[in-house]
Amino acid sequence: MSSDQFTLSVIIPAWNEGDYLPDTLASLEHAIQSLPNEVACEVIVVDNASSDNTRSIALSRGACVIFEPERRIARVRNAGAEAAKGDGLVFLDADTRIRATHLTAVVAGLRAGLAGGGVPIDFDHLEGALQSAGLRAWNALSRRAHWAAGCFVFARADLHRAVGGFSEAVYAGEEIAYSRALKRLAQHQGRAFRILDIQPVVSSSRKITWFRPWQHAIVLLTFLFFPWAGRFKRLTWFWYHRPHDG
């Protein structure tokens, strides 16, 4: 990559995210303002057939909006990447707030030769020691295994294309397969796929509120004993169902 001009594309998959997207875009706008002058940044919101005001919110904040009808998160991420013009890609969830340091660290890492990576995560509301312990366990596993959380994944655009993007064979867990694929390719090229040592991004804890502990346990056990569950839409309801949808 050139040591001079650099373009970053931030891709936000969004399905009915009118309640969360404004805060995410506000945090992103602040972060973009802190980037060096030689770094350009485009924001792409992928409207996944929303029925609320997601599209109008994104347009009002100056984002490029593209439409993807298929309800499969990997396809939505890939659609955004296909429209992106950047040297580097950041996949950011619509309910996740970032700091200026996240984008500057990503740009610095990619320009220094990183293949890609992720960041630690936090939630805006946790209740009790069990939830806090679960979060700490994930962040430790993420760093040890080099698995990026889906709410914030970044990569060189050329390497994203080289691994074929996110696997569209699955409905959930695509970020783990993506992390593994990029890590393998990075090793062959003498690069690294790394979880950055930086402050966590902050995601909504809505799934903790929406679903009961026993439902979380079912999801965990399903994927623990049946790792291929992500290939079946019925078994990935946790990522696609919202209680108020009925």
Each model region followed by its residue ranges:
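Cell-envelope/extracellular polymer assembly enzymes that use nucleotide-activated donors
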Residues: T7-S9, E42, A177
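Short, well-formed alpha-helical segments that are part of the catalytic scaffolds
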Residues: E17-Q33
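Glycine-rich, basic loop-to-helix element that forms the pyrophosphate-binding segment
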Residues: E68-A84
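Short aromatic/hydrophobic "clamp" motif used to bind/position activated sugar donors
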Residues: L89
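Conserved donor NDP-sugar-binding/catalytic core segment of glycosyltransferases
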Residues: A100-A129
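A short, conserved alpha-helix in the catalytic core of glycosyltransferases
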Residues: L159-V163, A169-G190, R194
